[in-house]
Design a protein with these regions (language model features):
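Extracytoplasmic beta-rich repeat domains
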Residues: 72-85, 113-135, 160-175, 190-195
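Repetitive beta-architecture junctions, highlighting loop-to-beta-strand starts
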Residues: 39, 54, 98, 145, ...
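Aromatic (tryptophan-biased) beta-strands that constitute blades/sheets of beta-rich domains
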Residues: 11-75, 109-118, 156-165
Length: 200
């Protein structure tokens, strides 16, 4: 039976599954984001310079025909544009509708799942394009213009900051990035110019 942690708010729901156990992880540091281990993909496009290059060389032109399906996981219904992030054998997936999952990268077993339900009057129809890892946290920018920090081992909510009033048209589709310990997050919806202009 999945274990559910409501975190004192029914909008903040984390479910831990029996497919795997929360594990201790090395914290994601600035040095790791600049030069990650070969098997890690800790940020969008892997490194801060955005090259999107993996140094792994086991799969090449001679071995690509040997690839076989190892596991599969269903994604939430909607527009999937996310980059899976990988650190210390855990994969972090951002789904549409502000759902985040942590999986065992080797087996596909779901370790935990966080759902940030979107208010009925928020613009919750687009992709959740990426999330960010730093320290022991996973950062999610939500459709209702909040920034949520999750414990990377358990999925529990560490903190949440509301950045703007979603009823004025502000929202997030792009994800945050972390640089020098600072979480940087833009905002969408500024083209509506109801009360404010764009900001980061």
């Amino acid at each position: 039976t999945p274990e559910v942690n409501e975190s004192g708010d029914t909008r903040r729901r984390t479910t831990r599954f029996g497919g795997g156990q929360p594990r201790a992880r090395r914290p994601v540091t600035d040095a790791l984001l600049r030069d990650p281990p070969a098997a890690d993909w800790p940020s969008w496009r892997r490194t801060l310079d955005g090259h999107g290059y993996s140094p792994l060389d086991q799969i090449d032109r001679g071995t690509v025909t040997d690839l076989r399906l190892a596991w599969v996981v269903s994604m939430e219904e909607g527009n999937n544009q996310a980059t899976p992030l990988v650190h210390d054998g855990m994969m972090f997936l951002a789904h549409p509708q502000n759902v985040v999952q942590a999986l065992d990268a080797a087996t596909g077993d779901v370790l935990w799942e966080y759902r940030h339900p979107v208010p009925d009057d928020a613009a919750g129809f687009g992709a959740t394009r990426t999330i960010a890892l730093y320290g022991d946290k996973v950062f999610l920018a939500t459709y209702d213009a909040a920034l949520v920090a999750l414990d990377a081992s358990t999925g529990d909510v560490a903190w949440e900051t509301v950045k703007a009033d979603y009823t004025s048209g502000f929202m997030h589709f792009g994800g945050p990035v972390v640089a020098d310990g600072v979480v940087v997050s833009g905002i969408n919806g500024c083209g509506r110019y109801k009360e404010e202009t764009c900001f980061i």
